[in-house]
Regions:
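Gly/Ser-rich helix-loop-strand patches that form or flank binding pockets
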Residues: 62-84
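Catalytic core of DAGKc-family lipid kinases
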Residues: 84-162
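Gly/Ser/Thr-rich active-site loops/lids in small-molecule metabolic enzymes
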Residues: 158-181
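ATP/NTP phosphate-donor binding region
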Residues: 1-50, 91-106, 116-127
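Redox-cofactor binding/interface segments in oxidoreductases and associated redox assembly factors
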Residues: 6, 53, 165
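Short glycine-rich anion-binding loops that position phosphate/pyrophosphate groups of nucleotides
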Residues: 57-59, 82, 169-172
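N-terminal glycine-rich "phosphate-gripper" loop used for MgATP/nucleotide binding
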Residues: 53-57, 65-66
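Short, well-ordered beta-strand core segments
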Residues: 51, 74, 163-164
Length: 181
């Protein structure tokens, strides 16, 4: 790996202090690194071999959605609370970077959900999710009827106040579709 894009949550990494340390470390090892404050500031990502995201799970999800389809791996450093989607905590960054630069890593592919909600009176909404989709009713007193499809095959029909569809981080290429009746 030679080129690194660093995305740093300015609220959690005051003045990009940690991002700047990472950049200096990478450059001292002959690598190229660029820092931005959010994934929306990145206009092109294909030049990078790795995206390093400093923040919580929300920042990792934002980057994963933004770069979906680019095939550039994302390495998350937890600056948040739980860090389900991040790889390391802040104190272990330098050791992790050393391992990455030494080639001691594996790229883990994680599933992204593509969801499509159709409602005859409103139309269609399509979204990408890393963790889950939550679909709820709009009106009090009315339940929703949802046909749930997995890879274009009807899985089941549900009548409920809402539905929660969650991803499994080890599977690939699964799409959920909800069709209101």
């Amino acid at each position: 790996m030679k080129n690194f894009q660093i995305i740093s949550d300015i609220e959690k990494d005051l003045h990009h202090e940690t991002a700047s340390e990472i950049k200096r470390y990478l450059e001292s090892h002959g690598k190229c690194a660029k820092i931005v404050g959010s994934s929306s500031e990145v206009t092109q990502i294909d030049w990078a071999d790795l995206v390093i995201v400093l923040g919580g799970d929300g920042y990792v999800i934002q980057a994963a959605k933004r770069f979906a389809g680019s095939h550039v791996p994302i390495f998350g450093v937890n600056f948040g609370t739980l860090g389900f989607l991040t790889e390391v905590e802040k104190p272990r960054i330098q050791k992790a970077l050393y391992e990455i630069l030494s080639g001691n890593y594996e790229v883990e592919k994680r599933m992204a959900l593509t969801g499509r909600v159709q409602k005859t009176s409103v139309g269609e909404a399509i979204g990408i999710a890393i963790n889950e989709f939550i679909i709820g009713k709009q009106d009090f007193g009315h339940m929703i009827t949802a046909n749930v499809y997995v890879d274009d095959e009807l899985m089941d029909t549900y009548v409920a106040d809402g539905i929660l569809l969650m991803s499994c981080c080890r599977e690939l290429d699964t799409r959920f579709e909800l069709k209101y009746i």
